[in-house]
Amino acid sequence: MVAEHATAGAVDGPAATRPRIRVQGAVKSFSGRVVVDVDDLVLGNQPIEGLIGPNGAGKTTLMRMIMHSTPLDRGRISLLPADGREVMLSSLAAHRMSRHGVVKSNQVIMDFDKLTIWDSLLLAVAEASYEQPHRIFSERTVFQRHEDEIRHYLDYFGFADPTAFAMSAGEKKLLDIVRCLLLKPSFLLLDEPTAGLPEDQTEKVMTVIRDVAGGGTSVVIVEHDLNVIWNLCGEVHFMAEGSVVLRGDPQSIREHRTVVEKYLGEGHV
């Protein structure tokens, strides 16, 4: 692989103090076609890492395999927490991932149409703090424990009326990101977190990502807006045809001939 070591990104922090995820011999096929075939991949050596590649490279499928929402055909995926106690993610039910600090945003936005913005976020903090969902709505003291944190994110992203429903794709995207943050992840997977957002909100999302990584969370981003990748990530993994074929610091990846030919095109270095 190119660039066997990556330069430090915008956020510092040794890998030993952060959780990592290891993917070993992970294969997934659909209708006889192999869409992911990853021999050995470690995510989390840098505070913020990027996963890029052309459409159909297997990026989102790999993220879903990590979350076990798409089961592996073979192989294993494990969480290596900072305390060293390995957790076999590929043996966990998808709904138990957040209990181990592994949280993923959604490329296809969750359906928030049946809950108000406020109620959607209350459910997230209920899950994060292991509260019974009904208590957070019915008991004032439980509600008050989480009110300030929710209001912070609502104000930061400019949700004008939290008692309303998230209507636009952009609002739903931001609401999904806030939901992830309220779950207090130790390892955060973000699938196209800035897709469709205006420039000012993209900048806010980037700031939040830096902040959460600065607090000790490992972050991996799948993103087609490469300015986000180049500006945030300390290490970038390049996927093509289901495999991770290159990894390195952003500069070495963006200049590599394979990336230019298969993804960027001439004139984009």
Predicted feature residues:
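Glycine-rich phosphate-binding loops of nucleotide-dependent enzymes
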Residues: V2-A8, G13-V269
